[in-house]
Amino acid sequence: MTEISLIAFDADDTLWGSQTYFNTVEKVYCEILAPYASADEVSHTLRATEKANIPLLGYGSKAFMLSLIENAVKISHGKVKGYDIGQIVEVSKELLRLPGHPFDGVKATLAKLHDTGRYRMIVFTKGELLDQENKFQRSGLRPYFDDIVIVSDKTPDAYKRLCKQFGVKAKQLLAVGDSYSEDIAPVLKIGGWAIHIPDYMDNEDRSYLNKIHPHLIRLSRFAELTNFLSPNSRLIDESKLS
């Protein structure tokens, strides 16, 4: 048995949907830019533009919007019309109004964990501060959490700072998230625990599904999370890992 004191939940595509909305915006974006390039070419160059902008813009809806505009100018060789740029801006703004509607089973599971009084529960997410705070507020999940921590990127050092902030050792931290590279791998690297709930809408390499680690639990649904937390203590039931 392993004692867990702090549970850090990812937000987008773990507590509520996000990637599907970005995919919808990108589809409309490709239609707007159809006079200049194929949808595949637009998406390919957009990925490259986003990646190049991460060091300066970081992650989130606003960073995505700026990359959409920059890529539109680039792929059209400066010929994109002002009206089309306006359309891109308007459709992108919809990402700033996402409802943050919790996935099935999320609210009930969080309520069950919260009501035990045995864990400190936080949202640990990356992205633009105001955007993430607004989604969190609209989600209706605030009563179940002690805090929300928003960082520019999720790295081993970011998880170490999180442990220091809340006064816990890495082995007392449990991270829950959909992205192996962002939510899972960094916390495993510092000796923490992780519950991976894969999101098949993401763009990650699927090879992570074959990874095995003694501190890694992989689930198919959020509601299964409580199966691995002992009902009468702050422990992970390791007997259920096999």
Regions found by a protein language model. Name each.
Residues 1-4, 107, 111, 115, ...:
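Asp-based, Mg2+/Mn2+-dependent phosphohydrolase catalytic module
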Residues 1-45:
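Active-site neighborhood of HAD-like aspartate-dependent phosphohydrolases
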Residues 22-30, 65, 69, 129:
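An amphipathic alpha-helix signature
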Residues 25-29, 46, 50, 88-93, ...:
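Hydrophobic alpha-helical core bundles mediating ligand binding, dimerization, or RNAP-core interactions
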Residues 28, 32, 36, 109-118:
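A short, Lys/Arg-enriched amphipathic alpha-helix followed by its capping loop at the start of a domain
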Residues 49-94:
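A metal-dependent, Asp-based hydrolase signature
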Residues 88-108:
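Long amphipathic N-terminal alpha/beta scaffold segment
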